[in-house]
Regions:
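Conserved, mostly hydrophobic/aromatic
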Residues: 27, 91, 132, 169
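Hydrophobic faces of well-ordered beta-strands that scaffold small-molecule active sites
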Residues: 13-16, 35-37, 59-63, 87-89, ...
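Short, acidic/polar
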Residues: 17-28, 71-78, 114-125, 162-166
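Structural motif
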Residues: 30, 82, 101, 126-127, ...
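Glycine-rich phosphate-binding active-site loops on the catalytic face of alpha/beta enzymes
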Residues: 35-39, 93-94, 136-142, 158-187
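Conserved N-terminal beta1-alpha1 strand-loop-helix module at the mouth
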Residues: 1-61, 67-69, 83
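Glycine/Thr-rich beta-alpha phosphate-binding loop at enzyme active sites
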Residues: 104-142
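Alpha-helix-loop-beta-strand connector modules within alpha/beta enzyme cores
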Residues: 45-65, 73-74, 81-82, 92, ...
């Protein structure tokens, strides 16, 4: 079953990916309904999520990057208790737990070579995420091939440096792109 937040992602072509708490105010001024939190620790992640919610946005937290969390299922439970609307992870175990809890799940993978791309397809099939995020994004042919072969929609992220990169990824079939480049958050 398709998670309701996938529609929000479809309507948010560029997702702000916040790498430090100091970047969050700028991300909340950008257009769109979703913010990716690629920062935080066990002491402040709840407050960061609350700030995103106060701006009427959805908070999707990169579980692997929250300082103090172990790569275990209980970490996903903790993030849900903190109010996260979804999780990002490179770990299929955490993706499966997020799905069990009803969170939006984003499986993040790195397309460093053809073997990694093949592995991504298998992991995505096994973990059944709502969305797959592939990095780096400026590879339109790879984005196109993955977007056509995956069951889950594809987010392109990493190394997005200009509007042309955004448009190329979207034209290649990506659902949306995620970027930490503030200049691109409102294109």
């Amino acid at each position: 079953m398709r998670h309701a937040l996938v529609t929000t992602l479809e309507n948010t072509p560029v997702i702000p990916a916040v790498k430090t708490p100091e970047e969050l105010p700028a991300a909340l001024r950008a257009e769109g309904g979703v913010v990716f939190l690629l920062c935080g620790d066990i002491l402040n992640i709840g407050e960061l999520i609350a700030q995103v919610h106060a701006a009427n946005r959805r908070a999707v937290v990169h579980a692997d990057l929250v300082a103090g969390l172990a790569p275990r299922e209980i970490a996903v439970d903790f993030l849900q208790c903190c109010g996260a609307d979804g999780i990002i992870s490179t770990r299929p175990l955490l993706i499966r737990r997020g799905r069990e809890l009803g969170l939006l799940t984003v499986l993040r993978a790195f397309g460093i070579d053809s073997k990694a791309i093949e592995s991504l397809a298998r992991e995505a099939e096994s973990a059944a995420p709502d969305v797959v995020e592939m990095l780096p994004a400026p590879m339109p042919r790879v984005v196109r091939r993955l977007a056509q072969s995956l069951r889950a929609p594809l987010i392109a992220g990493g190394l997005i440096t200009d509007k042309e990169d955004v448009l190329a990824a979207l034209s290649a079939g990506a659902l949306c792109v995620s970027t930490s480049d503030e200049a691109l958050w409102s294109i």
